[in-house]
């Protein structure tokens, strides 16, 4: 089968220190410090056979993630932008859904409690956690000490087929009755990024009390999905800051109640105006530009009457936050980081939300073939109008 794979050179920056979980020349948790001169190649690979607990899946839809873009995008010295766990060469693609082709005898379907049957529609977690290390045993699989990531450190779903252990799979058969088969798979490919948003605002951010105001900075897929989740959770004002007009309109269709163009308006002042000086109970930083947006974050906290605001940092960025501790102390505010989507009932809760009518499909703004991936990865480095480009043809 044909795959879209990324190759890069292991060439550590002078300040890079090999971590205890890094593997010299193979993998690192600090991708932007090591990998240089990335290239996309179409590579033929064997389909393979699933093991006893594994499932062979025919991929029906796979989203192009901003992380994929940043693994190809480089700085002036040729180093990739993506700062996280990576191992190359690797077939990209982690936001996918598909249908079961074949399953091992011990590959158990969580929906039925029995072995997976061929034809079951599924999506998958991207975080491949071990279940044995201390973080996993403590209930924090997103921080597994032996973590692998589909499409980052092990082969992903920019291919017609993928083999995944059943423990990371979730049935999306519940989408079929409400949405039909084609839309079922499109929505299935959005479960992963929507779960990243859910983990950020509900699990790590602690959720909200119905009637609270929230601010979302950035309307990429995670920011947009957060609008849908928080509106469904009972937020009063869901205020989105996003420079792209098309993204603002899309976000309004799935949950945002107010939108701000940060290129034309002062974000903090507009938030305080919309909330009549109250501010927000939760702020999501989903831009990846904390040094630019943080002044607005602190002004909302400092001048708003709301106490105990939680700021959740979800966008991956090799950038320092210009934090003022006094603002957090006086206003009893919190800053937390969010990574991943595994555990805590996140995937099944997101699937339940979509099954019962939370429609995040407006995020998909373009459908492409496998051959078109590279040019779209390049275009997305500068194009802010597309939200989610999705591969639907893998021939």
Language-model segments: what does each one mean?
Residues 205-210, 233, 249-334:
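Glycine-rich cofactor phosphate-binding loops and adjacent beta1-alpha1 units
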Residues 46-62, 77-134, 176:
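Glycine-rich beta-strand-centered segment in the early N-terminal region that forms part
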